Amino acid sequence: MRSSAIIALLIVGLDAMGLGLIMPVLPTLLRELVPAEQVAGHYGALLSLYALMQVVFAPMLGQLSDSYGRRPVLLASLAGAAVDYTIMASAPVLWVLYIGRLVSGVTGATGAVAASTIADSTGEGSRARWFGYMGACYGAGMIAGPALGGMLGGISAHAPFIAAALLNGFAFLLACIFLKETHHSHGGTGKPVRIKPFVLLRLDDALRGLGALFAVFFIIQLIGQVPAALWVIYGEDRFQWNTATVGLSLAAFGATHAIFQAFVTGPLSSRLGERRTLLFGMAADGTGFVLLAFATQGWMVFPILLLLAAGGVGMPALQAMLSNNVSSNKQGALQGTLTSLTNLSSIAGPLGFTALYSATAGAWNGWVWIVGAILYLICLPILRRPFATSLVI
């Protein structure tokens, strides 16, 4: 069973690399299809369309994986991604580009189903470690992808999309050959599958008791959108960073997060337990946010990165807490819901935090980091509630 978890990790890394490959050149491709003044608007719309489709469809695909198994849904997701990138690589007109993003968003359950596969394949005591590995693989893919995409973009704006399609095709073959089904209690009932759309508005009965932890998950994902949306702008405004320094800081940010998630999450959760590991991560990240708000020199950011990376151990611990409180036949629904919440935060976070930054930067541009730290404090009363460590529903 652990072999399936390892294959799932490889697929997550390849999928993330495919996503990262296209980011540096998507604006360039858009310039071939629309006037220059419309590029930014369409770029944002394409990113939002993917995230919105994930909000709606990721929980549904997770439910399908509970009913029909992880393997067929994961294969469909990888095939959908390969088709999406192929369409985008050869898009002759703008609407075809939108169709490609729509297809990818609808079928893009790779992360959710991979997480369900890992939950199926690992015991409760080791899930935080494996979810940490998954976060590290995703981070490594998102570091390597943009770097490779930038190089391929020098050849052609279409080349990174072709490479992303090939990567997902390779992941598809990898899953076909090596991935074994890990959810063996599915199917065989003869009953029609009841798929619940808009699951965030109507949680499954088995997940409803975890509403408070879902709220914590969403808040933490929302906080993560502060650096995602404002790292470059803040570095340029506060420290007058140039492009090279911005790139170096982003590479260091991603690398330290991947290292901590891969090598610190497991030992720390084994020693402290998932709840205390989560609290440790929140404290480290919140402290890093406050220090960033008051940093006056660019070099100060780099030691602060260690605190932010330590904060990254909290999310795998929280994901393990949630997974340990759900039975095996609801892991897909759970992971799909978490993917939906993640994408919802990626829509709301940049809009809210960039608006806050614009409104407060004239007086002091550190407020957005203070607000992020305050949001962590909101989670503390919720986490004081007792939650079961293993609840089979």
UniProtKB/Swiss-Prot annotation:
<feature type="transmembrane region" description="Helical">
    <location>
        <begin position="277"/>
        <end position="297"/>
    </location>
</feature>
<keyword id="KW-0997">Cell inner membrane</keyword>
<dbReference type="GO" id="GO:0005886">
    <property type="term" value="C:plasma membrane"/>
</dbReference>
<feature type="transmembrane region" description="Helical">
    <location>
        <begin position="102"/>
        <end position="122"/>
    </location>
</feature>
<feature type="transmembrane region" description="Helical">
    <location>
        <begin position="363"/>
        <end position="383"/>
    </location>
</feature>
<keyword id="KW-0406">Ion transport</keyword>
<feature type="transmembrane region" description="Helical">
    <location>
        <begin position="159"/>
        <end position="179"/>
    </location>
</feature>
<feature type="transmembrane region" description="Helical">
    <location>
        <begin position="244"/>
        <end position="264"/>
    </location>
</feature>
<keyword id="KW-0375">Hydrogen ion transport</keyword>
<feature type="transmembrane region" description="Helical">
    <location>
        <begin position="213"/>
        <end position="233"/>
    </location>
</feature>
<feature type="transmembrane region" description="Helical">
    <location>
        <begin position="298"/>
        <end position="318"/>
    </location>
</feature>
<keyword id="KW-1133">Transmembrane helix</keyword>
<dbReference type="Pfam" id="PF07690">
    <property type="entry name" value="MFS_1"/>
</dbReference>
<dbReference type="GO" id="GO:0015297">
    <property type="term" value="F:antiporter activity"/>
</dbReference>
<keyword id="KW-0046">Antibiotic resistance</keyword>
<dbReference type="InterPro" id="IPR011701">
    <property type="entry name" value="MFS"/>
</dbReference>
<dbReference type="InterPro" id="IPR005829">
    <property type="entry name" value="Sugar_transporter_CS"/>
</dbReference>
<dbReference type="InterPro" id="IPR020846">
    <property type="entry name" value="MFS_dom"/>
</dbReference>
<feature type="transmembrane region" description="Helical">
    <location>
        <begin position="6"/>
        <end position="26"/>
    </location>
</feature>
<keyword id="KW-1003">Cell membrane</keyword>
<dbReference type="GO" id="GO:0046677">
    <property type="term" value="P:response to antibiotic"/>
</dbReference>
<dbReference type="InterPro" id="IPR001958">
    <property type="entry name" value="Tet-R_TetA/multi-R_MdtG-like"/>
</dbReference>
<feature type="transmembrane region" description="Helical">
    <location>
        <begin position="79"/>
        <end position="99"/>
    </location>
</feature>
<keyword id="KW-0050">Antiport</keyword>
<comment type="function">
    <text>Resistance to tetracycline by an active tetracycline efflux. This is an energy-dependent process that decreases the accumulation of the antibiotic in whole cells. This protein functions as a metal-tetracycline/H(+) antiporter.</text>
</comment>
<protein>
    <recommendedName>
        <fullName>Tetracycline resistance protein, class G</fullName>
    </recommendedName>
</protein>
<feature type="transmembrane region" description="Helical">
    <location>
        <begin position="341"/>
        <end position="361"/>
    </location>
</feature>
<keyword id="KW-0813">Transport</keyword>
<keyword id="KW-0614">Plasmid</keyword>
<dbReference type="GO" id="GO:1902600">
    <property type="term" value="P:proton transmembrane transport"/>
</dbReference>
<dbReference type="InterPro" id="IPR036259">
    <property type="entry name" value="MFS_trans_sf"/>
</dbReference>
<keyword id="KW-0812">Transmembrane</keyword>
<feature type="transmembrane region" description="Helical">
    <location>
        <begin position="44"/>
        <end position="64"/>
    </location>
</feature>
<feature type="transmembrane region" description="Helical">
    <location>
        <begin position="135"/>
        <end position="155"/>
    </location>
</feature>
<keyword id="KW-0472">Membrane</keyword>
<comment type="similarity">
    <text>Belongs to the major facilitator superfamily. TCR/Tet family.</text>
</comment>
